[in-house]
Swiss-Prot record:
Additional free-text comment from the UniProt record: 99% depletion of LOX-H1 by co-suppression-mediated gene silencing has no effect on the basal or wound-induced levels of jasmonates but results in a marked reduction in the production of volatile aliphatic C6 aldehydes.
SMART domains in the record: LH2
Binding of Fe cation, residues: H557, H562, H749, N753, I899
Composition-biased stretches (Basic residues): 271-280
Annotated catalysed reactions: (9Z,12Z)-octadecadienoate + O2 = (13S)-hydroperoxy-(9Z,11E)-octadecadienoate; (9Z,12Z,15Z)-octadecatrienoate + O2 = (13S)-hydroperoxy-(9Z,11E,15Z)-octadecatrienoate
Major enzyme class: oxidoreductase
Designated name of the protein: Linoleate 13S-lipoxygenase 2-1, chloroplastic
Compartments where located: Plastid, Chloroplast stroma; Plastid, Chloroplast thylakoid
Domain of life (superkingdom): Eukaryota
């Protein structure tokens, strides 16, 4: 039986004593540069690791013919860069002279005679040939016989420009090659004189760290934490925390550009990465904004990525397409005059005359959106027909589809079981009016044809609700003061039919007291057997759908995946060494999340950005997500099984698959999600149990305990005193915590992100804002007459304006897009995992189970008994299929939140 961490693969790259070549001619051909015994890492005033190397004290040794040693070759793979500048010429000269990349090999263990670190072996790497678009640098070393295993390599980049180092392979050891995976930007020594540290691919708990690199391990973490002083520079890798205080312009004379600070007692929020930008002059709690938003260097989108990389497409749409649209649609309140005008977005397009010199680049980056019409020489924004309307153009109009999408649409996280009757608000009635709902027992029983009583329906788990009443009601009067948005608190009741589908029964819209008017509320039902009632129902649905769209984007998507994950990333880099096995397990799940979040703060969720200008809360959008965080977010309930239980959609049952019995058997998101959850959990279980075979290793792991403490007390510090935080004392505790995190970054995010264009690209299906009040709310005689004469126009006026709709459609298109280099879960093994045969085998099982899930989902989508994912014109539910081709496909589960 393989013992944890001890058994080695026959192809392991573990660095052992090299094979010795004692030929004196061979030895004499290799100079050895050995660092002095005082080789140290000093903490400078910014706490960056500094490797004290004095060239004058370094000796160039030539071994005698009796002194055993061997020559090894290190090959450094560097990815070619674009956007090169004038310093390239100087760097080319340095490459020719062989003085551009300096390496040190560091021994894994201390000198057993002296008890101190062994001298490092130094050599310059010379530029070699280019291979598959990468550049190889080669260095020759002579390794003394008593050097032992390689523990790390230090790099000094003597170019004037940073370089992206992919890996280093050292060949010549008797037991095979040593591989060191880097995948990191190495700064120029002209920006920062400190050397970079890269550890070997073997993972170690802190207590098992080889003695020769234990100090490097600790000091590298000190470097990554920084000292919290000053504005961060583009080449730095410092991870620190700050509140969301950069969404508005605190120094602006326009109050409409200012936003409150999110994070703290009044508006609790997760923390973001600290940039160190100067504070506002008028509000010292706020940070000034700038065009450059710092993220640690390795978190940024790589400039060597494909132009089709999703980050580039988002940037292009935000900074070129959206401004061009705004210049064309001069009236921001102009709606669509008729439904054919909406259809024209997909077959005629919108002229974009203002692209100018950005045009050629946009054709390459967003070819789905920007089309050149050759016969007219016009550039147009031409949308592709979303999958929903390709299958059934009128599906958005039907109640059965409205209900189905609560289980198999963009936002499957909001539907809840009704457990009490009658419905009551928990808000203060002195402020918001009577708490009792107007949805009566009689109405419900009438809508279900007296099939059963309300009491029986509640007892038998037949009633479900979309409840945005108490969350939205405190913001109704604030939002209604804004131009172009009309808000209500809403409740929508559904009935679970014998066929396993949901049937909408009633919508209640509520306005709290305002000025001298009392609370207003009204209930609408789909079976008002007259034309007026039918149109009122469609208008009420438009309001509810705008609420669900806003909640989806602000809470289910932004808050619960992007925003809440950033503290996990910061804590992991500050507290877990790069050689820690848990860091290496989590790392693929964190790629590019901080950069996409920074881009969101710059132009999506900022004051007057795309979200505020196009979704119903307007300037209160992100503030509303703070309210939801304070009232609803719990780490323990981010785990899919616990989330389903908390919403009444499942109960624990050991006799059922996944240990849960679902309240709605045909619940596509839950059905597929639970299979994926179990696959992730088994992978995490195998991984954790391998590195923590004894329970006491969890509590004694100082890095792990510091990591979890920092997540709870700093990253999510506004929730630090909550009793629901899991303990971290056993391997099972760790398995639960890690599985929850990786589920959020993979399955949860995929479920709420990659179907956005398919479901919401045709905006009548998912309007982001309702711009007009209900015709029955305090109407004048003229208003009522207009509605009675032009109900279709009333619905169109309620929908988003032309600029709101097209901006959101363009953004949703790129957010739903998979880049050609997308990294899907279980597709490729990480080099660190492949290093260990036990983890390698566990990954093969993980990958195989994910391929099986593909087949399971296909079979379910072809099962005619599953009406929530199969039927005439029904979109199959594929959002949790693990793999996808590039483009807008409505499927595919990447490791990380990179879009």
């Amino acid at each position: 039986m393989l013992k944890p961490q001890l058994q080695q693969s026959s192809q392991s790259t573990k660095a052992l004593i090299p094979s010795w070549n004692t030929n004196p001619l061979f030895l004499a051909s290799f100079p050895i540069n050995i660092l002095n015994k005082n080789f140290r890492l000093k903490k400078k005033n910014n706490f960056r690791v500094h490797h004290n190397y004095n060239g004058a004290s370094t000796t160039k040794a030539v071994l005698s013919s009796t002194e055993k040693a061997t020559g090894v070759k290190a090959v450094v793979t560097v990815q070619k860069q674009v956007n090169l500048n004038l310093s390239r010429g100087l760097d080319d000269i340095g490459d020719l002279l062989g003085k551009s990349l300096l390496l040190w090999i560091v021994a894994a263990e201390l000198d057993h005679k002296t008890g101190i670190e062994k001298p490092g072996i130094r050599a310059y790497a010379h530029r070699g040939r280019d291979v598959d678009g990468d550049t190889h640098y080669e260095a020759d070393f002579v390794i003394p016989q008593d050097f032992g295993e390689v523990g790390a390599i230090l790099i000094e980049n003597e170019h004037h420009k940073e370089m992206y180092v992919k890996n280093i392979v050292i060949d010549g050891f008797v037991h095979g090659k040593v591989e060191i995976t880097c995948n990191s930007w190495v700064h120029s020594k002209f920006d920062n004189p400190d050397k970079r540290i890269f550890f070997t691919n073997k993972s170690y708990l802190p207590s098992q760290t080889p003695s020769g690199v234990s100090r490097l391990r600790e000091e590298e973490l000190v470097t990554l934490r920084g000292d919290g002083i000053g504005e961060r520079k583009v080449f730095e890798r410092i991870y620190d925390y700050d509140v969301y205080n950069d969404l508005g312009e605190a120094d602006s004379n326009n109050d409409d550009a200012k936003r409150p600070v999110l994070g703290g007692k009044e508006l609790p929020y997760p923390r973001r990465c600290k940039t160190g930008r100067p504070r506002s002059k008028k509000d010292p709690l706020s940070e000034t904004r700038s065009t450059f938003v710092y993220v640690p260097r390795d978190e940024a989108f790589s400039e060597v990525k494909s132009v089709a990389f999703s980050g580039n497409t988002v940037y292009s749409v935000l900074h070129a397409v959206v401004p061009a649209l705004e210049s064309v649609v001069t009236d921001p309140n102009l709606g669509f005059p008729h439904f054919p005008a909406i259809d024209s977005l997909f077959n005629v397009g919108v002229d974009l005359p203002g692209l100018g010199d950005k045009k050629s680049g946009l054709f390459n980056v967003v070819p789905r959106l920007i089309k050149a019409i050759s016969d007219t020489r016009k550039d147009v924004l031409l949308f592709e027909s979303p999958q929903l309307v390709q299958r059934d153009k009128f599906s958005w109009f039907r109640d059965v589809e409205f209900a189905r999408q609560t289980l198999a649409g963009l936002n499957p996280y909001s539907i809840r079981l009704v457990t009490e009757w009658p419905l009551r608000s928990k808000l203060d009635p002195k402020v918001y009016g009577p708490p009792e709902s107007e949805i009566t027992k009689e109405l419900i029983e009438k809508e279900i044809g007296n099939y059963m009583t309300v009491e029986q329906a509640v007892q038998q788990k037949k009633l479900f609700i979309l409840d945005y009443h108490d969350l939205l009601l405190p913001y109704v009067n604030k939002v209604n003061e804004l131009k172009g948005s009309m808000l209500y608190g809403s409740r929508t009741i559904f009935f679970l039919t014998p066929q396993g589908t949901l049937k909408p029964l009633a919508i209640e819209l509520t306005r709290p007291p305002v000025d001298d008017k009392p609370q207003w509320k009204e209930v609408y039902s789909p079976n008002d057997w007259n034309a007026t009632g039918a149109w009122l129902w469609k208008l009420a649905k438009a309001h509810v759908l705008s609420h669900d769209s806003g909640y989806h984007q602000l809470v289910s998507h932004w808050l619960r995946t992007h925003c809440c994950t950033e503290p996990y990333i910061i804590a992991s880099n500050r507290q877990l060494s790069a050689m820690h096995p848990i860091y290496r397990l989590l790392h693929p799940h964190f790629r590019y999340t901080m950069e996409i979040n920074a881009l969101a703060r710059e132009a999506l969720i900022n004051a007057n950005g795309v979200i505020e200008s196009s979704f119903f809360p307007g300037k209160y959008a992100i503030e509303l997500s703070s309210i939801a965080y304070g009232a609803e977010w719990r780490f323990d309930q981010e785990a899919l099984p616990q989330n389903l239980i908390s919403r009444g959609l499942a109960v624990e049952d050991p006799n059922e698959p996944h240990g849960l019995k679902l309240a709605i058997e045909d619940y596509p998101f839950a059905n597929d999600g639970l299979v994926l959850w179990d696959i992730l959990k088994q992978w995490v279980t195998n991984y954790v149990n391998h590195y923590y075979p004894q329970t006491n290793l969890i509590e004694s792991d100082k890095e792990l305990q510091a990591w979890w403490s920092e997540i709870k007390n700093v990253g999510h510090g506004d929730k630090r005193d909550e009793p629901w935080w899991p303990e971290l004392k056993t391997p099972n505790d760790l398995i639960g915590i890690i599985t929850t995190i990786v589920w959020v970054t993979s399955g949860h995010h995929a479920a709420v992100n990659f179907g956005q264009y398919s479901y919401a690209g045709y905006f009548p299906n998912r309007p982001t804002v309702a711009r007009s009040k209900m015709p029955t709310e305090d109407p004048t005689a003229e208003e009522w007459e207009w509605f009675m004469n032009k109900p279709e126009e009333a619905l169109l006026r309620c929908f988003p304006s032309q600029i709101q709709a097209t901006k959101v459609m363009a953004i949703l298109d790129v957010l739903s897009n998979h880049s050609p280099d997308e990294e899907y879960i279980g597709e490729k093994i990480e080099p660190y995992w492949a290093e260990d045969p036990v983890i390698n085998a566990a990954f093969e099982v993980f990958s195989g189970k994910l391929k099986e899930l593909e087949g399971i989902i296909d079979a379910r989508n072809n099962d005619s008994k599953l009406s929530n994912r199969n039927g005439a014109g029904v979109m199959p539910y594929e959002l949790l299929k693990p793999y996808s081709e590039p483009g807008v496909t409505g499927k595919g589960v990447p490791y990380s939140i990179s879009i």
